[in-house]
């Protein structure tokens, strides 16, 4: 029998399985024996410990301990603190204004940039390749920083500089991974930047090559069963010009479909020198604006376009993430921290690869994130891998190791290979981003964010593939899977920049941060050419504190549209309806029409969501299908995506502005001159058009599905077809009975018991309002089972979490890591249509009309154990300190998992302390009565 390739070079430790033993275990064909899943032995650095004898005293002791991330602030003369990275901010508190946009800053200068005068940059694929242990070891090492010309390097100071761009590209382009990845953290090899780091710190350091915490507790769970079949490497780096490094890694190779010669997207940036390449694409928000300095913008590879990871269900993947940021924690233009932890939002990933806030790594190091890319329910549902809806999309000749009734390599037949797990848990649109403790907002704002598309038998990215399983969502058909011709990723986020054009952030205001300009894929008001046919738009709100409310309209010459344009413009506008097909990266049971045919939130108004999306909290993803050939749209037309959601502060949204008022410019922010300098007046400047679509002729055949065939029941029309059904239904008697036995927990997000330094807190199960401490454990569901053999069945551990707003007009988009939940109720009512049919990982609680202040969520815990997080995704709230730790424990676990504390000298562990209700919660079953 063939098996997945075991690691050929395990890190030296007695706990690692030998190659021969791994092969023997796999040949035995028992999933439960492929890997050792027992807790770490005593003596292992990550060994568990007994709960404190006096838990109250242990919890109280945490309040007086040093910050858990203190090791990140080391300076030549000792330790800094969280104020160190703020030292060079161009607007310290003494120079700040009372203006709202941007928060306590001044309007961002435009440098003559005109709206809709630059082409939108589409995402660039990372391009994973097969992880091959026979690839010769690379000769190039991760290049250390050196002095060089600004803005890509510092001309004088190595500790404030970056690696040479050509050297970094040569290293990233080198085939394979050296050293080869293993189950355990690589603590044998040294940090290749050690010499430069020691010169800066003026002392010796004990920094390993890999920043992952050592020991079995943070080793890759089920390493042999989910051995990575594909891999890639990238570096978080300061801004630099793209060299075309990843041109050959694009699936389309700039040769087919709309990305090929003659296609709409063959020219990546609309410039004469960007035909079929990203070489020369720089880091300006608009061609008229300055280049970003390497200390201002920190992106994946250090370049634009923004990056996209494309994965397939069933194929485990490894990302080697290098940290190429400055050694000096103050070399950051006054915001952002050089230590990072990467969270795949919201992957079904083991804790060691989830991006825990206090599992951060340092400049010069890498961290191997291994993402299994398996369907949730792997151990309990469809464990024989017999359901065609749970499958790996493939091309003829491809193979995949599957742990079914006859474990081994399976060959691609009829375009797919069946895999284990619950097909109802299929995900689609994700992203990954930094999660550094206390610095998530700053680091993500600064560029540490990429998008991630999951492909599956149901959502394979080939609209022509008709096997009765594939939903045939808009995509294209030139490739077997993963076509992006008519499938667009849109990262929308507000930003601000100073008078020199460099990105600016205010880290001093703990209420939240608002920029005064919205960028789409890091560009100021771009345009995009689209064909007259259907498209899928994957929309991510990547802001710090700003909610969005997006609308889509068509511009009409003359007065024939529903909405008048600005006075004297001779223009009017018509709504462009669409369907939502996925929410938070999860394809829904039904495609929800935003066309005025349904009262989507039962408020008596069908028009309030006609061509207008609901409020979109930070980190929420909405996938919509738009047809640019219907509703009167024709080639030559212009369409606009607008934001209608106004804010005054970062605490939460104000009101949505009427679409008519925005289009007529009755509502329009303007800059006025004041005694304190220029200031935005008469509204929020981001309430405006943000993206223009130019419709071009289409001569092909649109083979994509019609979302109208999948709508829920509505007046005059019966329920349509189902895309992906929910695993639980709120009105199903069997599900109601199951929910009644589920453990219940309550989390209240507010400011109770907060301090000036850490104002935002979370109360758990009626307890004290704590600020974040990674050593404190708030909740710990236990797995129902360990790894299972083919034929096993079950439901996993089911709990109900109530997420409650603490009041006072604030709003919080709460994110629970690891698993999606089904909203049972929102504010004591049934959820609106866009949540009724959805699985979610961000739960917006607030006073906005389509929000309400609490949700009860049914959520499962399966397959993996370890330490995870729950937090407000207004990341300025999270960083100050609206974040908590929860663990998934092994079956029957009695001891507590320890807490990693990283530093330049390695990672040490300390014991954890748990709340009194950490295992039992506060009851059983739903506790909110749902009204009509």
What are these regions (language model features)?
Residues 2-30:
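Gram-negative bacterial Sec-dependent N-terminal signal peptides
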Residues 32-361, 366, 507-537, 597-603, ...:
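N-terminal, post-signal-peptide metal-ligating segments of extracellular/periplasmic oxidoreductases
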Residues 32-45, 52, 238, 246-247, ...:
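Active-site pocket scaffolds in enzymes
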Residues 172, 176-243, 283, 299-350, ...:
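Beta-strand cores of secreted/periplasmic/IMS beta-sandwich domains, seen most often
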Residues 346-378, 492-718, 831:
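Histidine- and aromatic-rich segments of cupredoxin/plastocyanin-like copper-binding domains
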């Amino acid at each position: 029998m063939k098996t997945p390739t075991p690691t050929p070079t395990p890190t030296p430790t007695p706990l690692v399985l030998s190659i021969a033993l791994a092969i023997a275990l796999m040949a035995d064909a028992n999933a439960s024996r492929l890997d050792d899943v027992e807790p770490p032995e005593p003596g292992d650095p990550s060994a568990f410990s007994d709960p404190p004898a006096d838990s109250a005293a242990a919890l109280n002791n945490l309040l007086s301990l040093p910050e858990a991330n203190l090791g990140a602030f080391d300076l030549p003369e000792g330790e800094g603190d969280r104020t160190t990275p703020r030292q060079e901010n161009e607007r310290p508190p003494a120079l700040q204004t009372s203006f709202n946009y941007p928060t306590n800053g001044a309007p961002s200068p435009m440098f003559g940039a005109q709206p809709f005068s630059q082409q939108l940059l589409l995402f660039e694929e990372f391009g994973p390749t097969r992880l091959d242990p026979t690839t010769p070891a690379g000769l190039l090492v991760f290049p250390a920083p050196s002095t060089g010309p600004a803005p890509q390097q510092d001309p004088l100071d190595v500790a404030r500089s970056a690696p040479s761009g050509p050297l970094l590209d040569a290293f990233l382009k080198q085939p394979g991974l050296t050293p080869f990845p293993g189950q355990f953290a690589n603590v044998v090899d040294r940090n290749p930047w050690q010499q430069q780091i020691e010169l800066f710190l003026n002392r010796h350091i004990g920094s390993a090559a890999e920043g992952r915490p050592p020991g079995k507790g943070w080793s890759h769970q089920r390493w042999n069963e989910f051995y990575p079949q594909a891999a890639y490497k990238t570096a978080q780096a300061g801004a630099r010009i793209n060299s075309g490094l990843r041109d050959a890694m694009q699936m389309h190779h700039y040769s087919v479909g709309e990305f090929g010669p003659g296609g709409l997207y063959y020219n990546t940036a609309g410039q004469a020198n960007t035909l079929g390449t990203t070489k020369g694409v720089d880091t300006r928000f608009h061609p008229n604006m300055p280049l970003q300095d390497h200390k201002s913008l920190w992106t994946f590879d250090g370049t634009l376009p923004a990056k996209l990871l494309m994965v397939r269900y069933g194929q485990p993947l490894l990302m080697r993430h290098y940290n190429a940021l400055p050694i000096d924690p103050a070399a950051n233009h006054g915001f952002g921290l050089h230590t990072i932890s990467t969270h795949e939002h919201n992957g079904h990933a083991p804790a060691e690869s989830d991006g825990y806030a206090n599992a951060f790594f340092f400049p010069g190091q890498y961290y191997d994130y291994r993402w299994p890319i398996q369907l949730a329910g792997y151990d309990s549902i469809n464990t024989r891998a017999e359901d065609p809806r749970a499958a790996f999309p493939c091309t003829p000749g491809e193979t995949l190791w599957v742990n079914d009734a006859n474990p081994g390599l399976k060959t691609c037949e009829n375009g797919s290979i069946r895999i284990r797990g619950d097909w109802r848990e299929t995900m689609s649109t994700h992203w990954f981003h930094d999660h550094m403790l206390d610095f998530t907002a700053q680091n993500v704002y600064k560029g540490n964010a990429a998008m991630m598309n999951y492909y599956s038998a149901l959502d394979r990215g080939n609209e022509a593939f008709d096997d009765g399983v594939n939903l045939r969502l808009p995509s294209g058909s030139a490739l077997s899977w993963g076509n992006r011709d008519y499938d667009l990723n849109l990262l929308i986020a507000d930003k601000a920049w100073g008078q020199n054009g460099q990105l600016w952030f205010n880290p001093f205001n703990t209420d939240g941060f608002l920029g005064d300009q919205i960028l789409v894929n890091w560009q100021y008001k771009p345009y995009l050419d689209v064909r007259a046919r259907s498209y899928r738009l994957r929309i991510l709100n990547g802001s710090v504190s700003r909610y969005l409310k997006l609308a889509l309209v068509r511009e009409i010459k003359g007065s024939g549209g529903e909405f008048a344009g600005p006075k004297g413009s001779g223009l009017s506008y018509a709504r462009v309806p669409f369907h939502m097909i996925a929410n938070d990266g999860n394809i829904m049971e039904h495609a929800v029409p935003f066309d005025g045919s349904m009262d989507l939130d039962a408020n008596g108004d069908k028009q309030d969501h006609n061509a207008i999306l609901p409020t979109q909290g930070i980190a929420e993803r909405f996938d919509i299908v738009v047809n640019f050939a219907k509703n009167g749209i024709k080639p030559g037309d212009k369409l606009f995506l607008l934001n209608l959601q106004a804010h005054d502060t970062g605490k939460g949204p104000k009101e949505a502005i009427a679409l008519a008022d925005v289009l007529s410019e009755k509502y329009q922010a303007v800059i006025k001159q004041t005694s304190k300098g220029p200031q935005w007046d008469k509204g929020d400047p981001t309430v405006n058009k943000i993206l223009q679509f130019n419709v071009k002729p289409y001569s092909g055949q649109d083979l994509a599905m019609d979302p109208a065939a999948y709508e829920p029941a509505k007046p005059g029309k019966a329920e349509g077809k189902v895309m992906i059904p929910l695993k639980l239904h709120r009105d199903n008697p069997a599900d109601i009975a199951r929910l009644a036995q589920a453990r219940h927990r309550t989390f209240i997000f507010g400011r109770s018991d907060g301090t000036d330094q850490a104002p935002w807190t979370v109360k758990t199960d009626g307890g004290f309002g704590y600020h974040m401490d990674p050593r404190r454990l708030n909740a710990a569901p236990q797995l129902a089972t360990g790894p299972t053999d083919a034929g096993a069945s079950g439901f996993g551990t089911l709990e109900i979490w109530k997420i409650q707003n603490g009041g006072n007009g604030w709003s919080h988009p709460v994110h629970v890591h690891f698993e999606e939940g089904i909203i049972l109720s929102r504010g004591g009512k049934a959820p609106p249509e866009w949540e009724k049919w959805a699985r979610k990982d961000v739960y917006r609680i607030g006073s906005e009309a389509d929000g309400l202040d609490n949700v009860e969520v049914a959520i499962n815990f399966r397959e993996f154990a370890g330490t995870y997080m729950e937090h407000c995704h207004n990341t300025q709230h999270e960083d100050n300190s609206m974040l908590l730790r929860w663990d998934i424990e092994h079956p029957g676990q009695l001891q507590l998992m320890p807490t990693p504390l990283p530093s330049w000298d390695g990672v040490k562990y300390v014991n954890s302390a748990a709340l009194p209700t950490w295992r039992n919660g506060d009851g059983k079953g739903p506790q909110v009565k749902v009204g009509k």
